[in-house]
Design a protein with these regions (language model features):
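Substrate-binding/catalytic lobe of Class I Rossmann-like enzymes that use SAM or dcSAM, i.e.
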Residues: 166, 172-268, 274-277
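N-terminal auxiliary segments of SAM/dcSAM-dependent transferases
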Residues: 1-19
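A short acidic, Gly/Pro-enriched loop at the edge of an enzyme's catalytic core
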Residues: 119-131
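Conserved SAM-binding strand-loop segment of SAM-dependent methyltransferases
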Residues: 106-120
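A short glycine-rich, Lys/Arg-flanked "PGG" loop and its adjoining helix->strand segment in the class I
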Residues: 144-159
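Conserved class I S-adenosyl-L-methionine
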Residues: 60-67
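Conserved SAM-binding loop of SAM-dependent methyltransferases across substrates and taxa
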Residues: 70-81
Length: 277
């Protein structure tokens, strides 16, 4: 699928690049700042605990993370809660990194990964207690198919957690979808990305048969997360540029565009759904 191959232009870059500006867990999505003194590292751990709480995890559950990145969520849930985790990513380099980290943490038997596209992979029906998509649906062409697939692999009573950046509303999407900044992020950074209004994601979830249990506005948290990333990019610019001249400036430009839109054109939400039947 073209969208999967295109997103690899960003996510399959050398993992060391992301290690220069992300937290030690290399979590590449919004953190959660519970206090003014929270660092990026502590805020990302806060966020992982928040996800576990929203999912109602108690330990030992079967969890599927779609768009698992460098494994921050599955490694955390395996290490802290003993969950049996599966991560999906189209970027081969991420899988090698996760395997190394799982072995180093002593949780290799609880962590597996699959290279490919969620809608196309062979996954067990009702095989998971929880499914997570953190910043993943933006890279998937058909959200209706994503939610239908998530319902298929969740057990009855299982929980789906989705966090995603969204246009504020349909009118904003119409006005800004073709702007230069939107095109730069979509094409020059990710290769494929499609911001949608929250209403479209909720409709897709409900049409798939999910019950919505909560919606959280995490926009301010993502604004602060990206500000911390920008500071780290600036501090590590020379090391980042060692992987390609001008790469640090390109990353900074992308992050600045993202932060300029919060509350004006874009929001970031956490949506929790239950597979009630």
């Amino acid at each position: 699928m073209t969208a999967v191959a295109d997103t690899n232009q960003h996510y399959d870059l050398d993992p060391d690049i992301f290690g220069q500006f992300l937290d030690p867990l290399r979590k590449y999505s919004a953190a959660r700042y519970d206090a003014e003194h929270d660092t990026l590292e502590s805020a990302q751990r806060n966020k992982l605990r928040f996800v576990a709480d929203r999912l109602g995890l108690r330990g030992g559950e079967r969890l599927l993370d779609v768009g698992c990145g460098w494994g921050s969520l599955i490694l955390y849930m395996a290490s802290e809660l003993g969950c049996r985790t599966t991560g999906i990513s189209p970027a081969p380099r991420q899988h090698g990194y996760i395997a190394e980290q799982a072995a180093a943490r002593g949780v290799a038997e609880l962590v597996e990964t699959k290279v490919g596209h969620f809608e196309r992979l062979d996954l067990p029906a009702r095989g998971f207690d929880a499914v997570t998509l953190l910043g993943s649906i933006v890279h998937m062409p058909d959200p209706d198919e994503v939610f239908r697939r998530a319902k298929t692999v969740l057990r009855r009573g299982g929980t789906l957690y989705v966090s995603e950046s969204c246009f504020r509303n349909t009118a904003t999407r119409t006005a800004f979808d073709d702007r230069d900044g939107t095109g730069f992020v979509r094409e020059d950074i990710f290769g494929f990305g499609e911001l949608r209004p929250l209403s479209e994601l909720i409709a897709a979830a409900e049409n798939a048969g999910f019950s919505i249990t909560s919606v959280d506005d995490l926009t301010d948290d993502y604004r602060r997360t990206i500000a911390d990333w920008i500071a780290n990019v600036d501090a590590a610019a020379a090391r980042i540029d060692a992987h390609g001249p001008g790469l640090a400036a390109k990353l900074r430009h992308y992050l600045e565009i993202a932060n300029a839109g919060w509350g004006y054109t874009t929001k970031h939400y956490a949506l929790v759904c239950r597979n009630a039947r």
